[in-house]
C-alpha cells in the first residue's frame, strides 16, 4: 500500500506543464459544446438530456484524455454534426424561446444571463473531471499541476474557480448599490463567518481523511496542512477588510497591489530559496505555499468581482467598468456626463473585451521582464494576470455566442447539465472530491488498461452529472 502511495505521489510530482495555446484549444471544447447545443436548441423542441450530457460532459472528458493531442479535431467532431443536423432539420416554423424585445424591465437590477451560467458550468465540469483524471495515465502529465514554474490545465482550474466565485460575489455589492442599503459591518461579518465556517470544516475533514487514510498528497501544492478549501474559506473573510478601502480605491488596483507585493517578496534575496528549499519545521514553514499564494488568490477574487460589476446588471451603469454602481447610464445620459463617465459605462461584451486586452498587455509586459515565469504554487503576478486574461477572454466568447443566437438576458436557453452543476457548484465540487478519494482507495489507477480508465472516468462523470440533474429537477439547492 505504501509503495503504491509513493508511486501515486511521484506520478503528480516534478511536472513542468504545457503551453498556454494548447490549454486554450483544449478548453475551447466547452465553448464549442455550448455553441453546438444552442444550434440544436434552435431547431428542436428540446435537446435530449443524453445529447446534452454527451456534449457538455463526455466532450470535455474526451478533450483531456483520448483527444488531448488533437483538440482541433474534437472541436470539429462536435461542431460539424451539430451544423449538419441543423441543415437536416431546417428552420422550425415555431420557436418556443425567441427573445421578446421591448419587454426589458425599466427598473435597474440583476438578471440571469445564459453565457455566465454556461461559463461557470463548463469550468466546474472540467475541474471535477480533472481531479480524478489526473490519477490515470490517460490524462497527459502536462495537464497536471506543475511543481513550481509553468502553466497547466489544472493550475488554471483552481484560479478560475476563485475568479468565478468573485464574479458571483459581485452581485451582493451591486444589490447594495442599487437599493442604496448597505448592511452593517457585523451583519456582513456574521454572514461571511458562517459561510467560511462550513468551508473550514470541509478543509479540516479533508485534512484528517488524507492523513488518517494515508491518501497520497502533494505537499508542495499548498503545504502539509493547508488545502484549497481553506483558501476558499478565507478569501471572502479577507474581503471584509478590503471592502472599506474599495470605497476609495478600485478593486483592480488593490488586486494589482497585492500581486506586486507578493512579487516583491518572491524577488527579495533569499526569500524564494526559503519558499522552495526550507524545512517544514513549524506551521508557517510547513504551509508556506498556501499562505503566500493566498495573496494571489485574493487578487484573482477581486478581479472576478470587478468583472461582475459590468456583466451581472441588466443595463450599463455609470463607471461600471471598474466599480459597482447603482446609477443607470441611460437615466443619466440626458445629463452632461464627462467623457470618462461615458467611456467607463459599458455593456458586458465591451467591458470584457476592454479588460481582456488590458490584462493580456499587462501579462505580456510582465513576462518580458519577469526573471521566472507563471507559478500557481506561489500565485505570483504572472499567474494572476494569466488566470484573469483567460477567464475574461472565454467569457467574451461565451457572450458572443449569446449575441449570435440573440439570447435575451431573460431567456433560459442553457443546457440542463450546465445549469444543474452551476446551481449546486460547491456541493458538486465536494462530491467530486469524495468520489475521487473513494475511487483512488479502491482502485490501482496507475496500472489500469485504457479501457478500464475511460470506463471509470465515464462512470464517475455519469454519477456526478446524474446527482446534479436530480437535485436540479427536484429544486434542491445546497449553498455551502
Swiss-Prot record:
<feature type="transmembrane region" description="Helical">
    <location>
        <begin position="450"/>
        <end position="470"/>
    </location>
</feature>
<keyword id="KW-0337">GPI-anchor biosynthesis</keyword>
<keyword id="KW-0472">Membrane</keyword>
<feature type="transmembrane region" description="Helical">
    <location>
        <begin position="153"/>
        <end position="173"/>
    </location>
</feature>
<comment type="pathway">
    <text>Glycolipid biosynthesis; glycosylphosphatidylinositol-anchor biosynthesis.</text>
</comment>
<feature type="glycosylation site" description="N-linked (GlcNAc...) asparagine">
    <location>
        <position position="406"/>
    </location>
</feature>
<dbReference type="InterPro" id="IPR009447">
    <property type="entry name" value="PIGW/GWT1"/>
</dbReference>
<feature type="transmembrane region" description="Helical">
    <location>
        <begin position="381"/>
        <end position="401"/>
    </location>
</feature>
<feature type="transmembrane region" description="Helical">
    <location>
        <begin position="252"/>
        <end position="272"/>
    </location>
</feature>
<feature type="transmembrane region" description="Helical">
    <location>
        <begin position="291"/>
        <end position="311"/>
    </location>
</feature>
<keyword id="KW-0812">Transmembrane</keyword>
<feature type="transmembrane region" description="Helical">
    <location>
        <begin position="426"/>
        <end position="446"/>
    </location>
</feature>
<feature type="transmembrane region" description="Helical">
    <location>
        <begin position="70"/>
        <end position="90"/>
    </location>
</feature>
<comment type="similarity">
    <text>Belongs to the PIGW family.</text>
</comment>
<feature type="transmembrane region" description="Helical">
    <location>
        <begin position="114"/>
        <end position="134"/>
    </location>
</feature>
<dbReference type="Pfam" id="PF06423">
    <property type="entry name" value="GWT1"/>
</dbReference>
<feature type="transmembrane region" description="Helical">
    <location>
        <begin position="186"/>
        <end position="208"/>
    </location>
</feature>
<dbReference type="GO" id="GO:0006506">
    <property type="term" value="P:GPI anchor biosynthetic process"/>
</dbReference>
<keyword id="KW-0808">Transferase</keyword>
<keyword id="KW-0256">Endoplasmic reticulum</keyword>
<feature type="transmembrane region" description="Helical">
    <location>
        <begin position="343"/>
        <end position="363"/>
    </location>
</feature>
<keyword id="KW-1133">Transmembrane helix</keyword>
<dbReference type="GO" id="GO:0005789">
    <property type="term" value="C:endoplasmic reticulum membrane"/>
</dbReference>
<dbReference type="GO" id="GO:0032216">
    <property type="term" value="F:glucosaminyl-phosphatidylinositol O-acyltransferase activity"/>
</dbReference>
<feature type="transmembrane region" description="Helical">
    <location>
        <begin position="47"/>
        <end position="67"/>
    </location>
</feature>
<feature type="transmembrane region" description="Helical">
    <location>
        <begin position="228"/>
        <end position="248"/>
    </location>
</feature>
<feature type="transmembrane region" description="Helical">
    <location>
        <begin position="20"/>
        <end position="40"/>
    </location>
</feature>
<comment type="function">
    <text>Probable acetyltransferase, which acetylates the inositol ring of phosphatidylinositol during biosynthesis of GPI-anchor.</text>
</comment>
<protein>
    <recommendedName>
        <fullName>GPI-anchored wall transfer protein 1</fullName>
        <ecNumber>2.3.-.-</ecNumber>
    </recommendedName>
</protein>
<keyword id="KW-0325">Glycoprotein</keyword>
<keyword id="KW-0012">Acyltransferase</keyword>
